[in-house]
């Protein structure tokens, strides 16, 4: 029986991790084409931290409860939903509400939990797999044998990009901020790991590619990295900007972009229409989900926290010492 109330984590007011607190909230009702999921685990992502700080508010009409990805069991169907069925174990991309015992999700944004994964492993798939697939493979068209440069290789996005890049037979170069993180990236499959604190990633990338440069660059830094990415890119290279952790503004000489015929794309995931995210989910199910069985794909989980200690999970994320994903157990 589904209760009327649930435990959820809310942001008391914008601020430090201790602004997160566990409260009682009504269990949400699924609208048409939505499902209600009893959450077993929820992934923690950088946008959650930005929302807590007050600089990345949820889209209009979305719950103020943070959390963009979950895994659990479908326990109620909205009108018009035929798949997933009641009782199905799913992971889902949500626009908010993941830090709770129950969450609603558009049915088209739900994916079955791969048979080889636990619910907590499945909970950390949606945000990074949707992001990497959409930006690296759809928008940037990474091909077999090409070189992918990934900034922040030890992050959740970065480790996912390594896994998928290698699964689709690309050469993967990453940047990371310590010898330990570089070693972890190589162990995961990265061909080259560059410690950006000890050397210039542009020079290292060109050296690793015999002067050609990277065909696709996945950048979550922004700022002055945009011009440096252009220098590290190959002719006809594609640069995908997905975050601006290093700054929102950049100054660059446009001539190298034209001479190299570069393509720069930029996107966020959360505000995209449900139809777009449903299409990405369908593409993942067709192209990536089989790889959990055939290639043994598994996400990298650094740490697990109880839902009541979401603040601890945020403190770990802000320390930048984690490798891979952080998960809340509900």
Predicted regions and their residues:
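C-terminal hydrophobic helical "lid"/dimerization subdomain
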Residues: 2-4, 275-330
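Short, glycine/polar-rich helix-capping loops at beta-to-alpha or helix-loop-helix junctions
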Residues: 98-101, 176-184, 201, 249-254
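Glycine-rich phosphate-binding loop and adjacent beta-alpha segment
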Residues: 176, 224-296, 329-330
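Short amphipathic alpha-helix with an adjacent loop that forms part of the alpha/beta core around
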Residues: 201-211
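Glycine-rich beta-strand-centered segment in the early N-terminal region that forms part
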Residues: 26-44, 55-97
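Mid-domain Rossmann-like dinucleotide-binding core that forms the NAD(H)/NADP(H) cofactor-binding site
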Residues: 85, 123-198
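NAD(P)H dinucleotide-binding glycine-rich loop of Rossmann-like/cofactor-binding domains
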Residues: 50, 61, 89-154, 187
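Short glycine-centered segments of the SAM/dcSAM-binding site in methyltransferase folds
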Residues: 89, 147, 171, 237-238, ...
């Amino acid at each position: 029986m589904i209760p009327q109330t649930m435990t959820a984590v809310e942001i008391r007011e914008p601020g430090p991790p201790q602004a997160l607190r566990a409260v009682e909230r009504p269990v949400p009702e699924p609208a048409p084409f939505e499902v209600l999921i009893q959450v077993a685990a929820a992934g923690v992502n950088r946008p959650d931290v930005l929302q807590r700080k007050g600089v990345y508010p949820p889209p209009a009409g979305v719950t103020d409860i943070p959390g963009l990805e979950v895994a659990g069991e479908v326990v109620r169907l909205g009108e018009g939903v035929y798949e997933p069925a009641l009782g199905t174990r799913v992971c889902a991309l949500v626009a908010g509400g993941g830090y709770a015992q129950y969450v609603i999700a558009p049915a088209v944004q739900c994916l079955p939990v791969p048979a080889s994964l636990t619910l907590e492993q499945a909970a950390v798939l949606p945000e990074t797999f949707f992001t990497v697939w959409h930006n690296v493979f759809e928008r940037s068209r990474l091909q077999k044998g090409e070189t992918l440069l990934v900034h922040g290789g030890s992050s959740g996005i970065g480790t996912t990009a390594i896994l998928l890049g290698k699964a689709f037979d690309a050469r993967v170069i990453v940047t990371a901020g310590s010898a330990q993180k570089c070693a972890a990236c190589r162990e995961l499959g990265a061909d080259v790991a560059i410690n950006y604190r000890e050397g210039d990633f542009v020079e290292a990338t060109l050296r690793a590619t015999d002067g050609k440069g990277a065909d696709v660059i996945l950048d979550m830094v922004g700022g002055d990295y945009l011009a440096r990415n252009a220098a590290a890119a190959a002719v006809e290279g594609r640069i995908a900007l997905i975050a601006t952790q290093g700054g929102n503004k950049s100054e660059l000489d446009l001539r190298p972009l034209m001479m190299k015929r570069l393509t720069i794309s930029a996107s966020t995931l959360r505000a995209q229409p449900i139809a777009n995210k449903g299409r990405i989910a369908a593409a993942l199910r067709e192209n990536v989900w089989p790889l959990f069985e055939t290639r043994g794909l598994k996400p990298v989980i650094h740490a697990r926290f109880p839902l009541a200690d979401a603040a601890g999970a945020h403190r770990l994320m802000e320390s930048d010492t984690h490798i891979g994903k952080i998960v809340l157990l509900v």
